[in-house]
Amino acid sequence: MRSFQSSIAPLIQSFIRYRKASDHWNESSSEPNLLIFERYCLMNYPGFTELTQKMVDNWCRQRDTELNESCRVRIGPVVGFVRYLKERGLTSIYEPVIPKKEPRIYIPHAFTEQELTNFFCECDSLGVHPRNEPVLTRKLTVPVFFRLLYSSGIRTTEARLLRKTDVDMEHGILNIRYSKGRNQHYIALHDSMLELIRKYDIAIEKIRPDRTYFFPARNDSFHKRSWVQKNFHDIWYGVNKAHAVAYELRHHYAVKNINRWAGLGVTFNDKLLYLSKSMGHTTIESTKYYYSIVPGLSQILREKTETGFDWIVPEVEDDESNE
């Protein structure tokens, strides 16, 4: 990728190092958009020595051809850069206003038992040739990584950034330190998942004894988003036809839990609160979204909760993003 070349290049590079160190950096979109912004500044303000309000405002203005989400992706890294500079007293520029998220209708794939069986059997059948470290590591990691998503409902990012020290092997507790909105929380693993995690740890330890991340990539780093996407895509479409993405395993986890409550003499408020906390939602409103994708759940909730129905399932927007 082309390097930064302008007078503000050292500041941009410092910003990138900071975000990478805190594990909050998207290499696939953030860096390219910062490079395009720098190129825009060089072309339209030749010889500039510092960032100005006009430069930032002109770049961040929403274009006629842009949807809100497209604009958010394009200007987000620049807004983050300006915020970084302001927090350190390096600029007096005001942060541009980021367009609000547009309401969208997203219907996640409803996994069938056969599809999931096909998928996990294929995960378990990965080959070991050529017999080298990357291939052996993938053979061990992929089945456990995706089963962890399936059994715990954690985000793909949370699983990727999970450190070895974040996994309590004795009690089966995950310390989710890097989450959406930096909302640290803890996950209790099912006994069967804990057993699988322990076996994986023993096996991967023989290959990567000094690893930092629980699911290690090369150079003692964590796997990138593209690793999740490619592995899920290649395995899924090798045995299934319906469209699906890895993030939908999280939706599946929520729906399966909610469906299990039907017929149980339990308090839905308590169950929703527990599910909300375990999934790392900052507010219960985010969890209430799932009622809209479970067929018939609204009627079930009305029958179970009566007056509490409006509190449980008001109309809210989904604040989750697919990874």
Regions found by a protein language model. Name each.
Residues M1-E323:
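Conserved catalytic core of the tyrosine transesterase superfamily
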